[in-house]
Amino acid sequence: MSGLNGFEGDNFYIPMSNRTGLVRDPFVYEQYYLAEPWQFKLLACYMFFLICLGLPINGFTLFVTAQHKKLQQPLNFILVNLAVAGMIMVCFGFTITISSAVNGYFYFGPTACAIEGFMATLGGEVALWSLVVLAIERYIVVCKPMGSFKFSASHALGGIGFTWFMAMTCAAPPLVGWSRYIPEGLQCSCGPDYYTLNPKYNNESYVIYMFVVHFIVPVTVIFFTYGRLVCTVKSAAAAQQDSASTQKAEKEVTRMVILMVVGFLVAWTPYATVAAWIFFNKGAAFTAQFMAVPAFFSKSSALFNPIIYVLLNKQFRNCMLTTLFCGKNPLGDEESSTVSTKTEVSTVSSVSPA
């Protein structure tokens, strides 16, 4: 069905009218009428870069955590959950996208498109809700609205279960008829259908549900908890209510989690903003690149969390170096890290960045 500024097919939407006769099915034909071939090659190179970094970084994060028992602390379970989310995006999303970019169209077909869109949405939502759990944990531990509280393994596992449940309630509906996954941007990757008003799929109600429940609500919770947390940390520092080591540990853990939140928002906010604009301006003209740039930039979120974790968590850095160098840390920080870990584990929910 051709509109003024777009063309809707059975399983796709092209942001170009077919009055020129150029529009072709993105599952069958090359899409070089949307962009020059070099742009598809550039996209393939970008995805190759993300795979080359995302796979080893997230994979090594999981491996090092499994190798070192002192990293297997409750709050670290949530951080591992973030690495799992990154692995899902890399293995089940990026690999399909790079193949499509090399070929110039989504040649795997509609079923693979649905799988790729589902996995990308699932990974992104697991990461977002994991950050919500971390934000709530920081709020409860630092602000103490419930008095003295220790984040236990059962709390961590419950939090992980919650992240996957919420992620599934966002990613699964398009697979069962509430909206759908279709190619977007340069037609090399797939996402929810923000573009059409097809009554068969009830796209409007799903998109509103997704934006409100799975973006606005979690982001609001994160901002509220960190707003309260910053005020509490400043008040505690001014009143000297806690020891200097406890305050330092709490500040450093909080800084790490805040940077993870900032990284997620930097990666995903442009995509959410553009998707919202397209949704609320149905029929408006836009280019394939207009959606492609934020869509593919959002995929970089798979790298942010493990990099921040490695840079700011001294205990993890030492364990990583010990693993890399076959049991020896070339920096010789293992002993001091162990001492600081014992102090910080008792005060900051078993996380010890330094």
Swiss-Prot record:
Residues the record marks as carrying a glycan: 18, 203
Compartmental location: Membrane
InterPro entries, A to Z: GPCR_opsins, GPCR_Rhodpsn, GPCR_Rhodpsn_7TM, Opsin, Retinal_BS, Rhodopsin, Rhodopsin_N
Tissue: The color pigments are found in the cone photoreceptor cells.
Keywords: Chromophore, Disulfide bond, G-protein coupled receptor, Glycoprotein, Membrane, Phosphoprotein, Photoreceptor protein, Receptor, Retinal protein, Sensory transduction, Transducer, Transmembrane, Transmembrane helix, Vision
Cytoplasmic topological domain residue ranges: 65-76, 137-155, 234-255, 313-354
SUPFAM superfamilies given in the database record: Family A G protein-coupled receptor-like
Transmembrane segments: 40-64, 77-102, 117-136, 156-179, 206-233, 256-279, 288-312
UniProt GO MF annotations: G protein-coupled receptor activity; photoreceptor activity
Extracellular side: 1-39, 103-116, 180-205, 280-287
CC annotations in GO: membrane
Modification N6-(retinylidene)lysine occurs at: 299
Extra facts: This fish possesses three genes for green opsin. Two (G103 and G101) that belong to the LWS/MWS group and one (RH11) that belongs to the RH2 group.
Protein family (similarity comment): Belongs to the G-protein coupled receptor 1 family. Opsin subfamily.
Function summary: Visual pigments are the light-absorbing molecules that mediate vision. They consist of an apoprotein, opsin, covalently linked to cis-retinal.
Protein's UniProt name: Green-sensitive opsin-3
Organism name: Psalidodon fasciatus (Banded astyanax)
Gene symbol of the encoding locus: RH11
